Amino acid sequence: VGLIFAILSRTSLGNVQIFESKEHDSTNQDNRALALSNGSRLILEEIRVWDRLEKKITKIKKIHTSQAGSFGRTMLDTEEFNEESLGYIISYGDLMGALQEEVECIRNVKISYETKVTKCMDEKPSLNLTLQTKNKTKKFKSEFVVLADGSTEGIEGLELNKKIKHFNHAAIVTKVLSEIPHRNIAYERFTSNGPIALLPNKEDKFSLVWTGPLKFIEDLKKLNDECFLSQLHESFGDRVGSFEECEKRISFDLKQTHVEVMHSNIVALGNASQTMHPVAGQGLNTGFKDAYKLSQSLRDDLNTKNLETLINDYKQSRVSERKKILGFTELLVKSFSNDLVGFKKARGYALTLLDISRPIKQSFVRKMSYGE
């Protein structure tokens, strides 16, 4: 998200300096799957990065949603909505590589790798940063700072109001090979232990995201591959046949965070601003939109407003939209991770209504694809 903002702002700002704590090539082999919406694709097209990614992405042509042990299912299909795709799967390493290549072509944008910001002192009109590299400590002065892509913990001088909501759930992610090829279909299966998402990913494998109660996910991670795949098949059903192999499993706790920056000349974007449950797949795409909206404000209003006013206006404009996205995600979590009497039946009716009502389908797809 930070790289996207820098590329988008290359003509609005003078010199842009990016500080990255990791090594230059540290993300190249990172195969974590990212789900990009059509709105994010448009942003990547605008910054001339999409062409580099087209041969590396996997298109989602259909989305099949159902729940275990009850009626109700829906199928979303690109042919219904005149869309090339309902979303795209790309590896984190491929996305970062393409963004880094583009940044290295821009004269006024520079990246310093293996450089950690340890202090950010607000001494108006400037911000004074303390940087730690491998060999020494440096100072850097700026009138405007963007926090993006990562934790802000441990940066002295930052005043943040952070709200955290714990779901008492975790996620386990891996790649799995199924008996039946994915055919560019993504699956969302709601079970009594939490949602299972299977996302088509390159060589006929699926990227799996399985969320559920902490203890359940912990137990899944302890299983050997054969038992894990058997449990997955039992929970997911037969739509893609049996599961034949899986890669290394990674798990992490799920929480929703919202960070309010208390400085008038500092903005947080991406997961430095908010994190959310993966059930709706909106976390990264919201970060893309944050970066786009802020760069748009700089481009359109920097000549008529002072920087402090512009930043405040941007923050206010994003408050209501962020609340809607976080609220929508939380609603999905509560609605589809609840097995109380009546909920399963209500979910079945909701999925059936979504499947048979074209206007509701269109509205849902617009929201998930473009955030509208």
Model-assigned labels for residue ranges:
Residues G2-L3:
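N-terminal Rossmann-fold NAD(P) dinucleotide-binding loop
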Residues L8-R32:
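Glycine-rich FAD pyrophosphate-binding loop
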Residues S37-R41, Y92-M96, Q100, H169, ...:
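A general structural signal for well-ordered alpha-helical segments in protein cores
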Residues L42-E46, R52, K56-L158, K165-A171:
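Conserved N-terminal helical subregion
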Residues T137-K139, F144-G241, E245, R249:
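Conserved FAD-binding catalytic core of PHBH/FMO-like flavoproteins
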